[in-house]
Structures are given as C-alpha cells and as structure tokens.
C-alpha cells in the first residue's frame, strides 16, 4: 500500500523496470498519478498490458473515493488473460416493486449476492438498467432507471460483467481522460466500468474491441 513516485521518468516502462510485473507496475503508477506526482498523465509507452483479473482502480489507489483533478492515461493497450475470472456473476432472485418508489426494489431475496453495477433484466425492465446501490440491512436495491410494467413481485436477473478497468469503487471521479488506448477484450472481458458519479470522463481516440 506504499506509494512509489518517480519524479523524473514518470511512465509505465519505468514502473515495469522497477516492479518486474505488468499489472503491479500499472497499479503503482496509477496510485502515484492520483497522489500528486507532479505529473498529470501516465504514458503507457505503447505497451500492451496483460490483465489477469479485473483491475479495481480505487483499490489500486487505496485511499480516495473522490477525485476531481484532471488526470490522463494514454498510449497503450489492455488485454485480458483468458480464464474463468472474466465470467459474469449472475444472480436470479425475487423482489418487490412499486411505481410509487420507481428507483427501488424491495424485499430482495439474497440481496447480499447482488453486486453494484449489475445489469438488471426481467419482465418490465428496459434496456441498460443497472444496480446503483445495495442495502443489505433493508434488503433493497437502487436502480439507475425506473421500470415500466414490472409486476408487484417477480424474479429478476442481475448480471455483473467483469471489466478490464473498474472505477466503480470511486464515489465521484471527475476530469479523467483515457487517450489513445485500445481495449482488446477478446470476447472475455468488458472494457470500462465508470465511477458512481463524475463530470467529464473522456475517452479520446480509443478503441474498444469486443
């Protein structure tokens, strides 16, 4: 959990030389980037980073859940290492819904198994509706959008995809830029999970290949 900041040669290649491990080098470089390294961007030096498991970006930083100063990751590639770690986590369970409380499922059975960021599917559920919050005490799930035509009580399926870069641990991440980066998902991984809130998350000249 200790920070390691290169002041002179602040780039990914230098961190790889220091740590000898691609993923650890990226995590330590990202940690330094968000902790006043006197650099606003992290150059990946055109390198392809083999990712063995989803990278929890907030855990890599370790101390912040809010960050609102411009930072950039640029010039490289991320590619998953094939394996079951990328398989989506799927939970099917029952819950209650009322149009008077349109963004909440109540009486959710086994609510603790549902991950924030999960895609919600079921009767009356539109496209791209996700889990914003889970309350294991009240047995409720907060939704990103309201439902239309859902029954008062029914089954729902919650699918949590696995992302190369997962920023969902941040409560608010603003002015963050990913520039000239390719995400080679290879049919295994998803690309990027955004933070819960944040102004101007910018993908610039990037490719996300399924």
What feature does the model see in each segment?
Residues 40, 115-118:
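Surface-exposed loop/turn positions
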Residues 19-34, 52-56, 113-114, 183-186:
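Short linear interaction motifs
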Residues 3-14, 21, 87-101, 109-112, ...:
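Small/polar beta-strand repeat architecture
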Residues 1-3, 9-12, 18-19, 23, ...:
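Detector for repetitive beta-architecture
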Residues 52-55, 82-86, 127, 186-193, ...:
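Short glycine/acidic-rich loop motifs that flank beta-strands on beta-rich extracellular proteins
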Residues 43-45, 52, 74-79, 123, ...:
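Feature marks extracellular polysaccharide-active and adherence modules
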Residues 35, 64-67, 146-148, 167-175, ...:
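Right-handed parallel beta-helix/beta-solenoid
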Residues 23-29, 58-64, 162-168, 184, ...:
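Glycine- and acidic/polar-rich repeat regions and solenoidal domains
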